[in-house]
Regions:
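Beta1/beta-strand and adjacent pyrophosphate-binding region of the FAD-binding site
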Residues: 2-15, 31
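C-terminal catalytic lobe of FAD-dependent flavoproteins
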Residues: 266, 275, 297-435
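Flavin (FAD/FMN) cofactor-binding and adjacent substrate-gating region
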Residues: 71-72, 84, 93-170, 174-189, ...
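Glycine-rich FAD pyrophosphate-binding loop
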Residues: 24-44
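Glycine-rich Rossmann-fold phosphate-binding loop(s) that bind the pyrophosphate
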Residues: 11-13, 35, 362
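Dinucleotide-binding Rossmann-like beta1-alpha1 core, especially the glycine-rich loop
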Residues: 48-126, 266-271, 276-277, 298, ...
Length: 687
């Protein structure tokens, strides 16, 4: 058994096997270790569906690659991957569901995914067993279908071996140590004992330049060993297999092709053929998260007891949609753990705070994503970045504020929300509010309807004061939601008067030290500002593509204040930190501080913004303190507003006069009240 490789993949499910295959194809000396047998985690009990439908640009590319890749595996390896290209029929019972599909169509066209819309009559003519009188239409992908998860994994494993990849079963990773140049991974031989898989006394250490973890349901164990947080926790997922349906058997005996995968999103379920019968898979309410502290050794290729009471509604919906199955008995059932993340997207990319450690965790649609994940992950590892933007899947989109309970509650919600209408302005309520700025209660009392960004509550708009709790949820639409009228009023206030925006969720970093200027000049692509001035700039990747947009304020010759998007605090900090470590020897000492939670931000914008600030600024000459001469565009000054010290930045992203008011977080309520009172006589509106 080899003990030194260029890349080590930990986990032998579909995802890990695909990554090993694609690294081997790129010519890398690669090994895969699996603590049990290949596919023994979630892969073996997956339904094997390959849906191309996804609202995410990156995920759609991943799924499309998988579907195309799986079709080529047999020719390459000689193994049939079990791909049934039957198509996927995604039905709509409402016009709003059709609107969702119309929105998706733009993503599909951008990514080159073929689709057609079908009318109820067209569906009935093509598949007469499907009841259609209550449908508005459907979205049909003719190029996808379903696959045998074990077969496709074994085909990828054979392909990987053909590229020289070593695959070792019954070896468990028990420790990771970074030496500064490579990883030393302590591995233990696993043995059978009393039906359980237990560690033996045999251990080895594998040396690898790069490590990829694809540990599936064991992600929490991986997180503990690496000393990081991975919000990938399994949720129970059920599907049942029915006995043969005589009407279906007769239909197929007439020479008709297999039905497509039938997705009834409004009934939270999918149906597909299975040997003359049907499989019903559901995404029901109240499915619990499991193994939040790790998978017990006694749980191997096991299942949970079926909870039929949870899926009764979906079972009846299947009978409604395919009436011929009503008399088919229950043949088999599955209730197994499927990993989820708080937003439903997997965690794919560099691990936070670690060098040459890569995560491929949290796949709720792992079979669909496996092929594409392996392809794009290999690009990231070998080339430095993928050919598509993978930021939406980056593991660092959650910071250290994330906890086990948060992940459990959000993952359960995500499972429950698989088939809800995914409006562009969708906000999900679980585990909220969690991160709130001091002015949260004041804003809520004034009608704020909040959005969620990186755990922070941030006002999206201000609705009626007497709005019910579900006002925002009921206001959503794929066309023009009820929030529109309030957004119009807020936009008009900034265009014609003045508005106050809470931008506290912005990411904020201090970069200082003898090497700060040289480093930032290298790190960003615009000219650095003079002291007291600001510039808008971008941090680039090693390949020269855009990674992060920054507002940079130069506080002194060697001290800078960096402001970036609130959603990417950990993402930006990790990139900054690693870049500083790489360049400190060249540029000199550089200090990085995350001050996001120390500073609140209000943005005051509109033609009357200067009038509001003039009434509260503490300055020897208030009349000129905020003039273009004393406070020009793209400049920054420390000012006092009443008793509050403020780092004011003359910038606005509204196209109007404006300032960002960066203030001590503990003084936010004081400043809010001060500005609200001063703004009242100028018609200031909360925005």
């Amino acid at each position: 058994m080899k003990t030194q490789v260029k890349a080590l993949v930990v986990g032998g499910g579909a995802v890990g096997t695909s990554i090993a295959y694609h690294l081997g194809k790129r010519g890398w000396d690669t090994m895969l270790i699996e603590r049990d047998e290949l596919t023994s985690g979630s892969t073996w009990h997956a339904a094997g569906l390959l849906p191309l439908f996804n609202m995410s640009y990156a995920t759609t590319h991943i799924h499309k690659y998988s579907v195309d890749f799986y079709k080529s595996l047999e020719a390459e390896t000689g193994l049939n991957a079990g791909f049934a290209v039957v198509g996927n029929l995604r039905m709509a019972q409402t016009e709003e569901r059709m609107d969702e599909y119309r929105l998706y169509a733009s993503t599909a066209e951008t990514c080159g995914v073929p689709y057609v819309f079908m009318s109820p009559d067209e569906i009935k003519a093509k598949w007469p067993l499907i009841r259609t009188e209550d449908l508005k239409g459907a979205l049909y992908h003719h190029t996808d279908g379903y696959i045998n998860p074990a077969d496709v994994t074994m085909a990828m494993a054979k392909g990987a071996r053909q590229f020289g990849v070593a695959i070792e079963r019954k070896w468990q990773a028990d420790g990771f140590h970074w030496t500064g140049s490579h990883w030393e991974v302590t591995c233990t031989k696993m043995v059978e004992k009393g039906g359980n898989l237990v560690p033996s006394e045999e251990q080895i250490v594998i040396t690898a330049e790069h490590v990829v973890t694809a540990s599936g349901n064991h992600a929490q164990r991986t997180a503990k060993m690496l000393g990081i947080k991975i919000p990938a926790i399994p949720v129970e997922h059920q599907f049942v297999v029915l006995e043969q349906d005589p009407a279906l058997v007769a239909y197929r005996a007439e020479g008709n092709p297999e039905h497509p995968v039938i997705r009834d999103a409004d009934a939270q379920s999918y149906v597909r053929e299975e040997r003359g019968g049907w499989i019903l898979g559901v995404y029901e309410k109240e499915a619990p998260a499991r193994f939040e502290h790790g998978v017990p050794d006694s749980f191997r290729a096991d299942l949970f007891p079926l909870a039929l009471e949870r899926i009764e509604e979906q079972y009846m919906a299947m009978i409604h949609r395919v009436p011929s199955c009503e008399d088919s008995g229950l043949k088999d059932d599955f209730n197994g753990p499927i990993c989820y993340t708080p937003d439903g997207n997997p965690l794919v990319g560099p691990a936070p705070g670690l060098r040459n450690m890569w995560l491929a965790e949290g796949f709720s649609f792992g079979i669909t994503a496996a092929g594409g994940t392996g392809y794009y992950m290999a690009q990231m590892i070998v080339d430095g970045e993928a050919e598509i933007d993978m930021a939406s899947l980056d593991p660092k989109r959650y910071g250290n504020w994330m906890t086990t309970e948060f992940a459990m509650r959000k993952n359960e919600e995500c499972y429950d929300h698989v088939y809800i209408l995914h409006h562009p302005d969708e906000e999900r309520p679980a585990a909220r509010p969690l991160r709130t700025a001091p002015a949260y209660d004041r804003q809520k009392a004034r009608g704020a309807q909040f959005g969620w960004v990186n755990g922070w509550e941030r006002p999206n708009y201000y609705g009626p004061l007497d709005a019910p709790e579900d006002f925002d949820e009921k206001s959503r639409s794929f066309r023009r939601g009820a929030w529109w009228q309030y957004a119009v009023e807020e936009a008009r206030a900034i265009r014609q008067g003045v508005g106050l925006v809470d931008a506290t969720a912005f990411t904020k970093h201090i970069v200082k030290g003898p090497g700060a200027t040289a480093f930032l000049d290298w790190f960003t692509c615009n000219k650095l500002p003079r002291v007291g001035r600001i510039n808008l700039t971008y941090a680039l990747t090693a390949h020269g593509t855009t990674r992060t947009e920054y507002t940079i304020v130069r506080l002194s010759e060697q001290e800078y204040y960096l402001v970036s998007a609130g959603a990417w605090t950990a993402y930006d900090q990790d990139y900054l930190k690693k870049a500083i470590e790489d360049k400190e020897a060249d540029f000199g000492r550089i200090e990085l501080q995350d001050v996001t939670t120390q500073w609140g931000v209000f943005a005051l914008a509109g033609p009357k913004a200067r009038d509001v600030l003039r009434d509260v600024i503490n300055d020897p000459d208030p009349a000129t303190a905020l003039s273009n001469k004393r406070f020009p565009w793209l400049s920054a000054r420390q000012i006092e507003l009443g008793m509050c010290p403020v780092n004011a930045i003359r910038v606005a992203y509204t196209g109007e006069l404006g300032w960002e008011l960066h203030h001590p977080m503990e003084m936010q309520n004081y400043l809010f009240d001060l500005l609200e009172k001063a703004g009242a006589k100028h018609g200031m509106k909360l925005v």
